[in-house]
């Protein structure tokens, strides 16, 4: 019997390699996804501003002829698939995104966002979590978990490989250990940052005409909270007395600050905020349909005054610097305190000024 030729040996070796590669991919397909789901990693096409769904790409696949980066990849040590319901408005969804990212990392799971969250956040921020396509979402055997708004021990040891989170988490206790990563995720797109900085660059102090040395962003939440807080939660929103105290706190500590006011109730602000010192400007447009314009302004300021709500929280968290917030804004017996822990909502170094609850005591009298 003739010994095999060199050519035959090469062919045999190539066949073995081909079968090995096929076997490897079949193994990944069977172990990584539930029955019927595809093999590809899902990622958004970042060339689009608001892609409605994910595109499919393999690790290392370029996103386009002009793309310099590849599809975001989860580390090989991560497994499973976690996502979160995109409930609520802009600030709510920022909290859900950050909490999903943090809890998934803590539990060694891969995090994906749903298309609605991508549509809300991607036009504003350079977020990197890949998008879960609707057909994958509908065929995944999810277990659902509603989160409360503070970190708990059980959240550090969740064994479910396919988990869909819900609720309105926006507590620093979930993600503050990843602060720099969260700040990178919520980096503004260049055109929004530049537009906000252009607005701030044109501001002048009213009395002297000088450029301000310090910018203090002021977010005044009104709108639906005017009814929700007193009627449902036995609470108040920030009033003119609170805003005056907060501004005086900054005036005492910073030379020549300017207060950049944004609000979804700008008319009230113009009628009730004292502008006699020439250091207040009403810069926001207050349009709830385009919240990123006001948000970009706030994040480009040095410091923050917030009233209540997740929008103000995130503006302060990303701006850094000093933050003054409205404290004790509900009655002690409010049901709100069952779902909201102030110590988990506001960073320890932030400064709280107590709300005036006298309007609530008046309402409570028979």
Curated annotation (Swiss-Prot):
Lumenal side: 26-366
InterPro entries named among the record's database cross-references: Glyco_trans_11
Major localisation: Golgi
Transmembrane parts of this sequence: 9-25
Membrane topology: Single-pass type II membrane protein
Sorted UniProt keywords: Glycoprotein, Glycosyltransferase, Golgi apparatus, Lipid metabolism, Membrane, Signal-anchor, Transferase, Transmembrane, Transmembrane helix
GO CC entries: Golgi cisterna membrane
A GO term for molecular function: alpha-(1,2)-fucosyltransferase activity
Top EC class, one word: transferase
Residues glycosylated per entry: 66, 302, 328
Cytoplasmic side: 1-8
EC numbers: 2.4.1.69, 2.4.1.344
Coiled-coil zones: none
Any GO BP: positive regulation of sprouting angiogenesis
Catalyzed chemical reaction(s): a beta-D-galactosyl-(1->4)-N-acetyl-beta-D-glucosaminyl derivative + GDP-beta-L-fucose = an alpha-L-Fuc-(1->2)-beta-D-Gal-(1->4)-beta-D-GlcNAc derivative + GDP + H(+); a ganglioside GA1 + GDP-beta-L-fucose = a ganglioside Fuc-GA1 + GDP + H(+); a beta-D-Gal-(1->3)-beta-D-GlcNAc-(1->3)-beta-D-Gal-(1->4)-beta-D-Glc-(1<->1')-Cer(d18:1(4E)) + GDP-beta-L-fucose = alpha-L-fucosyl-(1->2)- beta-D-galactosyl-(1->3)-N-acetyl-beta-D-glucosaminyl-(1->3)-beta-D-galactosyl-(1->4)-beta-D-glucosyl-(1<->1')-N-acylsphing-4-enine + GDP + H(+); a neolactoside nLc4Cer(d18:1(4E)) + GDP-beta-L-fucose = a neolactoside IV(2)-alpha-Fuc-nLc4Cer(d18:1(4E)) + GDP + H(+)
Annotated metabolic or biological route of this protein: Protein modification; protein glycosylation
Cell compartments where the protein resides: Golgi apparatus, Golgi stack membrane
Function field: Catalyzes the transfer of L-fucose, from a guanosine diphosphate-beta-L-fucose, to the terminal galactose residue of glycoconjugates through an alpha(1,2) linkage leading to H antigen synthesis that is an intermediate substrate in the synthesis of ABO blood group antigens. H antigen is essential for maturation of the glomerular layer of the main olfactory bulb, in cell migration and early cell-cell contacts during tumor associated angiogenesis. Preferentially fucosylates soluble lactose and to a lesser extent fucosylates glycolipids gangliosides GA1 and GM1a.
Protein family: Belongs to the glycosyltransferase 11 family.
Protein name, entry field: Galactoside alpha-(1,2)-fucosyltransferase 1
